[in-house]
A protein has these predicted regions:
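An N-cap/entry alpha-helix motif that binds or orients negatively charged groups
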Residues: 2-56, 120-125, 129
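Conserved, mostly hydrophobic/aromatic
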Residues: 18, 69, 91, 132, ...
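Glycine/Thr-rich beta-alpha phosphate-binding loop at enzyme active sites
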Residues: 34, 38-49, 186-199, 244-298
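Short beta-strand/loop segments at the ligand-binding rim of alpha/beta enzyme cores
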Residues: 60-68, 142-149, 213-234, 294-305
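Catalytic cores of alpha/beta
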Residues: 76-85, 234-248, 293-294, 298, ...
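A gly/proline- and charged-residue-enriched helix-loop-helix capping module
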Residues: 94-144
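Active-site-adjacent beta->alpha loops and helix N-cap segments on the catalytic face
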Residues: 99-108, 129-130, 187-222, 235-237, ...
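Active-site glycine- and acidic-residue-rich loops that bind
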Residues: 153-166, 193, 199, 227-248
Length: 317
């Protein structure tokens, strides 16, 4: 109540010209709380809700509940313990790239308050796989599943993309319960071309094979699951290609969806480039999820992203 009444409005006022200020303010405080066991216990006691009815066992991972925090919130893994204490069933951290990169120039997040939406063109700002590996080696892993989203560095040529992904996979393998292959951000030039059938097939084949090889080297009984995150702007033919590749390459889950380049239905006009998320994407995300569900026939789990801002209505997946 205090957060909604006082803290949130103050954060919005002070970050009106650059919403990223509010995000960094919150992340820094969550990072501080992550180093206090007392604070973590208090946060968990106030937020955690446990019920056997909510538990799920999917691709060899036990989830205490099916509601997770999507990638992009904690890009560098600085606040995972505090975020886990909020009651999430899992956290997807990242996206991480092989090389540290600042992302695109600020401001790069824009609020569309009338539409309950955001436009972002972040461009995968992160500390890089090496630095994040060192950080995670020093921190205690939260009790809930942690997945890491991996993407292509901006400086890496398209023809070297596979090795770029594999480098991050190797660096983060010991600290992750599953991996998300991000090929759908609209803010890295050429990244979405990796969703095309042939490059997607080559990329996912290499990542799954490397995950299996790493499992053997570490005497792990099973390889870490590999998931893929797709764009909402794909046509049905493109979705069919994604489904075919995922089934062929033993992809363990499809995350639907990332942000959209479309601006359909907006009441608040904006000329800013980037990916749109929030309420205007709700319908399209559900359309993609339904299409995947109808054509996958329960062969691969589907993780919906950004389609819930509260209790879902009857009939929603």
């Amino acid at each position: 109540m205090l957060f909604k009444a006082l803290i949130r409005p103050a954060m919005f006022r002070t970050s009106a010209n650059d919403p990223e200020i509010a995000h960094h303010w919150l992340m820094n405080r969550m990072a501080t709380l992550s180093h206090s066991q007392t604070a973590l216990k208090i946060i968990e006691a106030a937020n955690a809700y446990k019920s056997p009815a909510l538990e799920r066992d999917i691709f060899g991972v036990h989830f205490p509940n099916p509601v997770g925090l999507a990638g992009g919130f904690d890009k560098n893994g600085i606040a995972l313990p505090a975020l886990a204490a909020l009651g999430f069933g899992f956290i997807e951290a990242g996206t991480v790239t092989r090389y540290a990169q600042p992302g695109n120039a600020r401001p790069r997040i824009f609020r569309l308050s009338v539409d309950n939406a955001l436009i972002n063109r972040m461009g995968f700002p992160n500390d890089g796989a090496d630095a994040i590996h060192e950080r995670l080696a020093r921190l205690k892993k939260p009790a809930i599943p942690i997945g890491w989203s991996i993407g292509k560095s901006k400086v890496t040529p398209q023809e070297e993309a596979i090795e770029d992904y594999l480098y991050s996979l190797r660096k983060l393998y010991d600290f992750s319960d599953f991996f998300t292959v991000n090929v759908s951000s609209p803010n890295t030039p050429g990244l979405r071309k990796l969703q095309d059938k042939e490059p997607l097939d080559q990329l996912l084949q290499a990542i799954v094979q490397e995950s299996e090889a790493l499992a053997q080297r570490t005497d792990s009984p099973t390889a870490k699951a590999v998931l893929v995150k797709i764009a909402p702007d794909l046509t049905e033919d493109q979705l069919d290609d994604v489904i075919e590749v995922c089934l062929q390459r033993n992809i363990r889950g499809i995350i639907a969806t990332n942000t959209t380049l479309a601006r359909t239905g907006l009441r608040q006009t904006s000329s800013e480039s980037g990916g749109l998320s929030g309420r205007p994407l709700h319908t399209r995300s559900l359309e993609v999820i339904r299409y995947l569900s109808q054509h996958l026939d329960n062969k691969i789990p589907i993780i919906g992203v950004g389609v819930s801002s509260g209790p879902m209505t009857p009939g929603e997946p």
